[in-house]
Amino acid sequence: MNTEATHDQNEAQTTGVRLRNAREQLGLSQQAVAERLCLKVSTVRDIEEDKAPSDLASTFLRGYIRSYARLVHVPEEELLPGLEKQAPLRAAKVAPMQSFSLGKRRKKRDGWLMSFTWLVLFVVVGLTGAWWWQNHKAQQEEITTMADQSTAELNADKDSGQSVPLDTGAATSQDTTPAQTAPAPATPVDSTAATQTPAPTAAATQNTVVAPSQANVDTAATSAAPAATETPSALPTSQAGVAAPAADPNALVMNFTADCWLEVTDATGKKLFSGMQRKDGNLNLTGQAPYKLKIGAPAAVQIQYQGKPVDLSRFIRTNQVARLTLNAEPTPAQ
């Protein structure tokens, strides 16, 4: 009768109550049990209160309860009915295995994506090359057009310049005539020769200028000698009065190492030069600053402005037509 009553009493007690009673009979505290089982005191308390922590898997909880039962000498078989209620076993969720075809589809999709990426890359590279080639071709056409224009302008200048020698010759003849006739009045004139030449008109006046000189030569050779000596003495005086022009501080000096097309315009819009310069040539231009320059081959020219070299490296690196403006810098006071 006593055995059956004890068995019924054990069945009425839960797992946590039985473990707590066994611990108290052995005189152990919750701290001591936790240290022996290497558990937290809160975990031991939850087991004795028949609580299942939400963050603890049922498999670990059943293992802790069995270790606790062995520690307090409680048979595990007597705790099995309570374990099923307190820590029931749950079926593990197993993800279904993916078929091999899914991996193949993913690999195929990655292959298409890679092919599309390469296609886009090739298109971008092709467009970039086409853009560069168009710019290069446009620059070459612009240089050719400018060279043709400069050639046409040079031909026009040559055609218009054929009349220049005639004008200069006429001007020199007009200049030399007063120069030749100017010394004539300075020569001594006899009164008899002067009375022989009438002066009613301008033509007669010219004859009177020539006649005294001839009469002077015929009558007295000694009077021609002072006139001859006076003429050379006047030449140094005229030469001394001519001074060399001062160098323009805003002058452009250019030296060419190869054939190059060039156009230079000053502030007034006047074209100081437009045409082709040959290798080993040099050019010195003066005008009103600032100057606007257009150079077909920047690497073929060296420019000095106000005694300083002009940097054209940025145009040489890009191999393009140089368009730049040179501003006048104030010169320091002397």
From Swiss-Prot:
Domain HTH cro/C1-type: start-end pairs: 19-71
Residue ranges: DNA binding: 30-49
GO annotation, cellular component aspect: plasma membrane
First and last residue of the signal peptide: none
Periplasmic topological segments: 133-334
Low complexity composition bias: residue spans: 170-211, 219-241
Gene3D superfamilies (alphabetical): lambda repressor-like DNA-binding domains
Protein's GO biological process: regulation of cell shape
Top-level division of the source organism's lineage: Bacteria
Pfam family, one: RodZ_C
SMART domains linked: HTH_XRE
PROSITE patterns, per the entry: HTH_CROC1 (PS50943)
Region called Disordered, residue ranges: 155-241
Cellular localisation: Cell inner membrane
Keywords annotated in UniProt: Cell inner membrane, Cell membrane, Cell shape, DNA-binding, Membrane, Signal-anchor, Transmembrane, Transmembrane helix
Cytoplasmic side, ranges: 1-111
Membrane-related topology note: Single-pass type II membrane protein
InterPro entries, per database record: Bact_Cytoskel_RodZ, Cro/C1-type_HTH, Lambda_DNA-bd_dom_sf, RodZ, RodZ-like_C
Major location category of this protein: membrane
Bilayer-spanning residue ranges: 112-132
Single GO MF annotation: DNA binding
Domains: entry comment: The helix-turn-helix (HTH) motif in the cytoplasmic domain of the N-terminus is involved in the formation of spirals to maintain the rigid rod shape. As this protein is anchored in the cytoplasmic membrane, the HTH motif may contribute to protein-protein interactions to form the RodZ helix, which is localized beneath the cytoplasmic membrane. The C-terminal domain may be critical for determination of the rod shape by probably interacting with enzymes required for synthesis of the peptidoglycan layer, including PBPs in the periplasm.
Role of this protein: Cytoskeletal protein that is involved in cell-shape control through regulation of the length of the long axis.
Membership in a protein family: Belongs to the RodZ family.
Name of this chain's protein: Cytoskeleton protein RodZ
Organism: Salmonella typhimurium (strain LT2 / SGSC1412 / ATCC 700720)
Gene giving rise to this polypeptide: rodZ
